[in-house]
A protein has these predicted regions:
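Conserved phosphate-binding elements of NTP-dependent enzyme cores
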Residues: 1-955
Length: 955
């Protein structure tokens, strides 16, 4: 038999490397690279150079594709074939897990506690070892077994005559004739009604309109040793009849003693069910607050929105929900009701009496004025009975009714505000659940603690619990402590378990997933991370680096796309991709251990060595001498602070993660400015006063939220220049001959778009129980338009070709067309030269979306009195890109505007005109203003962590 030998051309399998050969995804230029396994590998380079194309679109996607191929043919038919990355070969690839920064959970029920599963273990802990307290008296609840009840009776009432009573009715009206007859037929002789023992008689009944307490006398006996068996049997029978509750009437003094197999308050008689983990879940009907259903907040009518101008009369439109149609059925109700009650609807609302206004707004069902309405009018609802409901009850009913359309509910929502639920005070849980405590703390109290304080509470908890509690809680505590420690290790000390997931930044949610992965203790995995340092102060970087190294040390390959200097230098292997963005990038500029990279000529090496840097300005702007002054800010952890914002300057808000920066700016200052400039409904957190608002006329917050929620949204449509491009194509001679208007070139209009994908370029395949899959349209091949539309060309390019151009290419292409060129040039100026004009909004990172918004604002005319707020605009930016961004920000400030930036990046902090440093720590250890002034003076502040790291920039 012939021996089969391996072909000589085949290379042996590389166990120590992930080898990528011929990668051409997006702008990658047929690159080959060997990435060492089980090491911390950092991909860096300018924005758009191809880092994510290699890490996510090639390595991660190929890993996912191979995983899908391991499914059965039956399972794969529901998923479809994943497109293979444009690469010749990848070897040495282990299972891949991606931890990205743009996938945040928008579910209002999702919290840090539920995502990390710490809250699940906390619920289990409270269900098993918490002690119950009465919400009436605050005293500990008691419960007894049958044996304990008998033993207790003998200990306390030995030798006394007692009656054993089973409660049948507690605090209810009725004559109870049938109940009395039923127990009489069973052989019982006496009952106790409202405290009085009486004989059971035929046809016995009580006053049906009074509230009654009725107990059945099950047995009467003297407590003695020879009565032990009889007492045990009576107790057992009584508990059955009384549904685990019984009373003991001591005949000597008439004292009534209560016993229960359930948790019970000895003084008031209230009882709780035995707790299960669901009793502490706000996502379960067994634990959720019945008012807000576990959300912690409720929609309430905002009277200021319903009645914004009291100088108007009702007929002049004072009550906004009534609208402008005076012949509408609801307005007829108001008119007829007002006429019957002699309310003048032509009088200004402020001149009406409080009673008259309340009648109009809230109705008075007691009046029932028998309104003279034509009930044949189809616009009048069937349930209208003739009494006047009132504007506000009507709005509430429309909002809460299951029969209301989404459109109606959305309209009513305009007149409502989200406020904290008054029943549970925002804790989300029902009253009983909050009275189960461990060491005097309920589960909501623990959920509100910062994670570092929560970890401290768990330290030494065993010393504060009984031996029995410790035996039960041992394994649960181990799980909670481990998960908490992982979160602390990635710098999330300032978060709380109750923090909603939707309020987390991309960086925070990514670090939570990183902590979860560390907790899973998986080995042999290739992790791909996207800028985990986002939102992290320099002080916390070492914690993050240690977490990444721990992930590596337990036997995983860690690939990180990152721009942070500390993480680059801490890596085992650094890959610099470039040299520039888009078609000018996509090459491996340098690779190897960080110390080797420093000797290369790459742009990254120049910045790491300090040969290139962002210069400290020689002169800082003096501003316009005007201020916005905010006093007594107390939201979240802010400690009643006063702060001044000088106008006409670049202001930096600095401080460690969780110190209170977002609370001050995003949750207090911005809502106040927005309310002043646009009369918005945003509600600021607690403050005492604000001055200087008259010095601004616009406020613009440029955050990292997506520029669109669907694949149809793109930079060209968002920035507004696509309309002008369509107009340009409509002016081409061939288009004029065919009679094409600008609408023909819109992928949202039927006439010009592809009729299969309806202008999306992609078709959505619904997968029922799996996520929808997007595939290229087979008719237009992703071009969005039909053949006739694509035949129209401007300078040899179709409308689809233009959408596929990068910003850099479009700047060159449209240079002769000033009104288009100017708007596209601004996108290039903010460092987005590499993205395409038609790139789907859902593929843009948070940082890219923010810079698209920034470019849109730059393209608008301003009055020089605009207040801009930017939250971490350096996200996703290389050193070189930050320089471009600062040039753009300088242009805004030089026009007289104010730009306020929340930032951790020292390159931005050092060029500020004015710094406000908050701290010193995160959470409860922060919330104070440590410094206000210029960067040179900040470095003298000893308790500021920002100052410590800023010193190096001034050496």
């Amino acid at each position: 038999m012939a021996k089969v030998t391996k072909a000589s051309t085949e290379e042996p399998f590389q166990k120590d490397f992930i080898e990528v050969l011929g990668a051409r995804e997006h702008n990658l230029k047929d690159i080959d690279i060997r990435i060492p396994k089980n090491q911390l590998v950092v991909f860096t380079g300018v924005s758009g150079s191809g880092k994510s194309s290699l890490a996510f679109d090639t390595i991660y996607n190929e890993g996912q594709r191979r995983y899908m191929e391991s499914f059965s043919a039956y399972a794969r038919q529901f998923i479809g074939d994943m497109e293979r990355p444009d690469v010749d070969k990848i070897t040495g690839l282990s299972p891949v897990i991606s931890i990205e920064q743009k996938t945040t959970n928008k579910n209002p029920r999702s919290t840090v506690g539920t995502v990390t599963e710490i809250y699940d273990f906390l619920r289990l802990l409270y269900a098993r070892v918490a002690e119950a307290y009465s919400y009436n008296t605050g005293k500990k609840m008691v419960k007894f077994s049958e044996e304990e009840i008998v033993q207790n009776i003998f200990e306390k009432y030995d030798g006394k005559k007692i009656s054993v009573l089973a409660p049948l009715i507690r605090g209810r009206k009725g004559h109870y004739r049938e109940l009395f007859e039923d127990v009489r037929k069973k052989g019982y002789l006496k009952v106790r009604v409202d405290g009085e023992v009486m004989d059971l008689k035929p046809k016995m009944q009580v006053d049906r309109y009074k509230i009654h307490d009725i107990e059945l006398v099950v047995d009467r006996l003297a407590v003695a040793d020879d009565m032990k068996l009889r007492l045990s049997q009576s107790v057992q029978k009584t508990l059955q009849l009384g549904k685990d509750l019984m009373f003991l009437l001591i005949q000597d003094d008439g004292k009534l003693v209560q016993y229960s197999k359930q948790l019970m308050c000895e003084e008031t008689g209230i009882s709780y069910e035995e707790p299960s983990p669901n009793a502490f879940s706000f996502n379960s009907p067994y634990g959720a607050c019945p008012t807000c259903r576990g959300l912690g907040n409720v929609y309430t009518i905002d009277i200021d929105t319903v009645l914004p101008d009291t100088s108007l009369s009702v007929n002049e439109g004072a009550i906004v929900p009534l609208g402008e149609e005076r012949d509408a059925s609801v307005f007829k109700q108001v008119e007829d009701f007002a006429r019957k009650n002699k309310i003048n609807l032509n009088k200004p609302v402020k001149e009406l009496t409080a009673q008259q206004l309340n009648l109009i707004l809230y109705g008075d069902k007691g009046i029932n004025p028998a309104l003279e309405l034509d009930m044949s009018d189809e616009s009048i609802p069937d349930f209208y009975t003739g009494s006047y409901e009132g504007i506000i009850p009507m709005l509430k009913r429309w909002f809460s009714s299951g029969n209301s359309s989404d459109m109606l509910r959305g309209w009513v929502e305009k007149f409502m505000v989200l406020s904290t639920c008054s029943t549970c005070n925002g804790t989300r849980l029902k009253k009983e659940s909050l009275w189960f405590k461990i060491d005097k703390w309920n589960i909501a109290d623990l959920g509100n603690l910062n994670l570092d304080n929560l970890a401290a509470w768990f330290d030494g908890l065993e010393l504060r619990m009984s031996d029995k509690q410790n035996a039960i809680a041992k394994d649960i505590l181990k799980e909670i402590r481990e998960r908490l420690q992982f979160l602390l290790n990635v710098g999330l000390t300032y978060l709380s378990l109750n923090r909603p997931s939707k309020s987390l930044s991309g960086g925070e949610s990514q670090r939570i997933r990183l902590a979860t992965q560390i907790g899973s203790q998986l080995q042999g995995i290739t992790y791909v991370l996207d800028e985990p340092s986002i939102g992290l102060h320099q002080r916390d970087n070492q914690r993050l680096i240690a977490a990444l190294q721990h992930l590596r040390d337990i036997g995983n390959s860690v690939i990180v796309v990152e721009h942070d200097k500390d993480i680059m230098l801490a890596s085992d292997y650094l890959v610099d991709i470039g040299p520039r963005a888009g078609k000018h990038g996509g090459e491996i500029v340098a690779k190897g251990p960080p110390e080797n990279i420093l000797h290369s000529n790459s742009e990254t090496a120049q910045y790491l060595l300090g040969k290139k840097s962002i210069a400290v300005p020689k002169v800082r702007r003096k501003g316009n001498g005007k201020f916005i002054e905010l006093k007594g800010v107390q939201g979240n952890n802010l400690q009643d602070i006063d702060v001044k914002f000088p106008l006409g300057k670049l202001i930096l808000i600095t401080g460690v993660s969780g110190s209170g920066k977002s609370t001050l700016i995003n949750e207090t200052l911005y809502p106040l400015l927005s309310k002043y400039c646009y009369n918005s409904k945003a509600v600021p957190l607690a403050y005492k006063s604000i001055k200087g608002l008259e010095h601004i006329d616009k406020v613009i917050e440029i955050d990292q939220s997506p520029i669109g929620r669907t694949p149809r949204s793109n930079p060209a449509t968002y920035c507004g220049f696509f309309t002008e491009i369509r107009t340009l194509f409509a002016s081409v001679p061939e288009a004029k001959i065919r009679g094409y208007k600008p609408g023909r070139f819109s992928f949202n209009v039927k006439s010009g778009r592809c009729d299969v994908c309806e202008g999306g370029g992609m078709r959505v395949i619904e997968m029922n129980f799996l996520p929808d899959v997007h595939v290229h349209c087979e008719k237009c091949n992703g071009k969005r338009y039909n053949r006739e539309t694509l035949e129209i060309r401007y300078k040899g390019k179709s409308i689809s070709d233009v959408l596929d151009m990068t910003v850099d290419e479009a700047v060159e292409f449209f240079q002769p067309v000033p009104f288009i060129y100017r708007k596209i040039k601004v996108l290039q100026d903010v460092g987005l030269g590499y993205i395409t004009l038609g790139q789907s909004a859902v593929t843009l990172s948070g940082g890219e979306a923010q810079r698209v918004k920034l470019s849109t604002e730059l393209g608008k005319k301003d009055t020089g009195k605009t207040f801009y707020i930017l939250d971490e605009p350096t996200t996703g930016l290389h050193f070189q890109d930050i320089k471009h961004l600062l040039d753009v920000i300088d242009k805004l400030v030089d026009r007289g505007n104010t730009v306020l930036v929340i930032e951790h990046n020292m390159d931005v902090i050092k060029v500020a005109d004015h710094i406000i440093d908050i701290g010193p720590e995160g959470g409860d250890g922060g919330g104070r203003i440590l410094f206000e002034g210029q960067p040179e003076d900040l470095i003298k502040v000893k308790e500021s962590f920002t100052a410590k790291y800023l010193q190096a920039e001034f050496k």
